[in-house]
C-alpha cells in the first residue's frame, strides 16, 4: 500500500510571499488535496541575519488570504538545528561524511584555479581520505558528505523528466559548518524526511539541489521523495520576473484589488494546463491538477490577463461579498480617497445597492471603489474635466427646469425618476442624452457612471436633489 501523499511549502522569511512562491504553494496545496493528502508548511529561517518576524507574518497572512490552508503546526527549521547536527554526526560515524580542515585561503585558491582552467569551482577532496591526526591544531573543521566520485546521480522528475549528473561534477558538499550550524542542503533533507514528505514540488532553480540532496538521502539510507521542479515565472517580455512585471508580494495584489479566487485561478494557469479551459473553480482545480500537465518552459506573467480574469470574478461575485472585499482594502486604499479605514453602515448599504451597476465594468476592487466615488464624495462634488464640459452652456438652466419634475415625485426609484426625466426631455423637445448626461455629471462629478437612474435611486431623494441644486446658477 502506498504512503499517504505529503507535500510541503518551505519559504525563506527574508521578504514577502512573492508571486512565484504563491504559485509553488498553490501547486503543493492542489496536489495534496487532489490525493487526499496533507500539505505542511515549513519556514526555512536558518539565515538569522535576513529572516524577520515581519516576513514570516507576511507569508502566513498571504497564504491565508489566498485560501491555502496548511495541515498541522508551522515548522521552523532553525528550531531543529540540534536534530540536523545529530544526523551529520551519524553520517560521520558511518563513514559517509568526514571532517574537512581546508582553510578559507585554500578554498579560494581552488576557486581561482578552476576559473583559470575554465571549469566550475569545486572542492578537490583533499581531506576526504587524510588521517585525522594530520589535522592542524586549533582549527574547527566542517563536516562534508563523502559523495560518490564515480558514476551518475539520477533524478526522475515529474516535470523535467530523467535528469542525470556525472558524480565527478558534484563535489563533497558541506553538511555542518565549523561553528556547528547545519547547511541548507542537510537541513532540507532531514526536515523533509522527518516530516514524511513524499512529493517535493518547487522551482526548477532547485534542480541541481535535487541531485545533491539525493546523495544525502542515499548516504543516510532514506527513501528519496518524488520530485517535481516547476518552471520559473518570467515577465510578459520573456525576461526574468521583476517588480515591474509583477514580482510583488501577495499583499500588494490584495491591496490593488484582486480577489483571492481570481489570483488562484490565474496562478494555476501559469505553467499548468487542462485542455483549453481557462476558468476553474477551486473544486475543478483540485480534481484536474496533474503534475504531468506542467510544461517545462518558463510561464509568462501577464497583468492584462490577470485583470481580465479578475473582472470576470468580480462580475460573478455576490454584491455583499464585493462590499466586504472593498472593506478589507480600505486600510490601504481608503485614506488617500478621504475614506475611513472601515465602511460606515450607511456607505455599506449604498454600496450594496449600487453594486449591480458598478461591477459590470470594473477589473479590480480599486476600480470598483473609484467608480463608487459618487457615493462617498463630499458636497459640492469636485468635477472632472469631462463633467465640467457637460455642465457648461445651458446645461445648468436645463437642470433647473428639470428639478420641479423630480421634486414632485411621490415615489423615488429608478423607474419613476426615469419616467420623469424622459417626459421632461420630450416636453423640451431634446434627446434624452441632452438631459441625462449633465444630470449624471451633476450627480457623480464624472462623465461615466452606472446607469443614471440607478444613481438617482441609490443616492436617494434628498441627496440627489441637493447635488442638483449645487449646480444651479445663483
UniProtKB/Swiss-Prot annotation:
One GO molecular-function entry: zinc ion binding
Placement of sequence motif 'HIGH' region: 11-21
Reactions listed under catalytic activity: tRNA(Glu) + L-glutamate + ATP = L-glutamyl-tRNA(Glu) + AMP + diphosphate
Domain of life: Bacteria
Localisation per UniProt entry: Cytoplasm
Annotated positions binding ATP: 243
Keywords on record: Aminoacyl-tRNA synthetase, ATP-binding, Cytoplasm, Ligase, Nucleotide-binding, Protein biosynthesis
Main location: cytoplasm
Keyword Nucleotide-binding included in the entry's annotation: yes
Matches recorded under Gene3D superfamilies: 1.10.10.350, HUPs (3.40.50.620)
Protein family: Belongs to the class-I aminoacyl-tRNA synthetase family. Glutamate--tRNA ligase type 1 subfamily.
This protein's name: Glutamate--tRNA ligase 1
Amino acid at each position: 500500500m502506498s504512503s499517504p501523499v505529503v507535500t510541503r511549502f518551505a519559504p525563506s522569511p527574508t521578504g514577502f510571499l512573492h508571486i512565484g512562491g504563491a504559485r509553488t504553494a498553490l501547486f503543493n496545496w492542489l496536489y495534496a488535496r487532489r490525493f487526499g493528502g496533507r500539505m505542511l508548511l515549513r519556514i526555512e529561517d536558518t539565515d538569522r541575519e535576513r529572516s524577520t518576524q515581519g516576513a514570516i507574518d507576511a507569508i502566513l497572512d498571504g497564504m491565508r488570504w489566498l485560501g491555502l490552508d496548511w495541515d498541522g503546526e508551522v515548522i521552523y527549521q532553525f528550531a531543529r538545528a540540534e536534530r540536523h547536527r545529530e544526523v551529520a554526526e551519524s553520517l560521520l560515524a558511518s563513514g559517509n561524511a568526514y571532517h574537512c580542515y581546508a582553510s578559507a585561503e585554500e578554498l579560494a585558491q581552488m576557486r581561482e584555479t578552476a576559473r583559470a582552467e575554465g571549469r566550475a569551482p569545486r572542492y578537490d577532496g583533499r581531506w576526504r581520505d587524510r588521517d585525522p591526526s594530520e589535522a592542524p591544531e586549533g582549527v574547527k573543521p566542517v563536516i562534508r558528505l563523502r559523495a560518490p566520485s564515480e558514476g551518475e546521480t539520477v533524478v526522475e522528475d515529474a516535470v523535467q523528466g530523467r535528469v542525470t549528473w556525472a558524480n565527478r561534477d558534484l563535489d563533497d558538499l558541506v553538511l555542518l559548518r565549523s561553528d556547528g550550524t547545519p547547511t541548507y542542503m542537510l537541513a532540507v533533507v532531514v526536515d523533509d524526511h522527518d516530516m514524511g514528505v513524499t512529493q517535493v514540488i518547487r522551482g526548477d532553480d532547485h534542480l541541481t539541489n535535487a541531485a545533491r540532496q539525493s546523495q544525502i538521502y542515499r548516504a543516510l539510507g532514506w527513501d528519496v521523495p518524488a520530485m517535481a521542479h516547476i518552471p520559473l515565472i518570467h515577465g510578459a517580455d520573456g525576461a526574468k520576473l521583476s517588480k515591474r512585471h509583477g514580482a510583488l508580494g501577495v499583499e500588494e495584489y490584495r491591496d490593488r484589488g484582486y480577489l483571492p479566487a481570481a489570483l488562484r485561478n490565474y496562478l494555476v494557469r501559469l505553467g499548468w494546463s487542462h485542455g483549453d479551459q481557462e476558468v476553474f473553480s477551486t473544486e475543478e482545480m483540485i480534481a484536474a491538477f496533474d503534475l504531468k500537465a506542467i510544461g517545462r518552459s518558463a510561464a509568462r506573467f501577464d497583468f492584462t490577463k490577470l485583470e481580465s480574469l479578475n473582472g470576470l470574478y468580480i462580475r460573478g461575485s455576490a454584491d455583499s461579498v464585493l462590499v466586504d472585499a472593498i472593506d478589507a482594502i480600505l486600510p490601504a486604499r481608503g485614506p488617500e480617497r478621504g475614506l475611513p479605514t472601515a465602511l460606515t453602515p450607511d456607505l455599506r448599504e449604498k454600496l450594496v445597492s449600487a453594486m449591480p451597476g458598478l461591477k459590470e465594468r470594473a477589473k479590480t476592487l480599486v476600480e470598483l471603489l473609484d467608480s463608487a466615488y459618487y457615493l462617498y464624495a463630499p458636497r459640492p462634488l469636485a468635477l472632472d474635466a469631462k463633467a465640467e464640459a457637460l455642465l457648461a452652456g445651458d446645461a445648468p438652466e436645463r437642470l433647473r427646469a428639470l428639478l420641479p419634475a423630480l421634486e414632485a415625485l411621490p415615489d423615488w426609484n429608478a423607474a419613476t425618476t426615469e419616467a420623469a426625466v424622459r417626459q421632461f426631455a420630450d416636453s423640451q423637445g431634446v434627446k434624452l442624452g441632452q438631459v441625462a448626461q449633465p444630470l449624471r455629471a451633476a450627480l457623480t462629478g464624472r462623465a461615466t457612471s452606472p446607469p443614471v437612474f440607478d444613481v438617482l435611486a441609490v443616492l436617494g431623494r434628498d441627496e440627489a436633489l441637493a447635488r442638483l441644486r449645487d449646480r444651479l446658477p445663483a
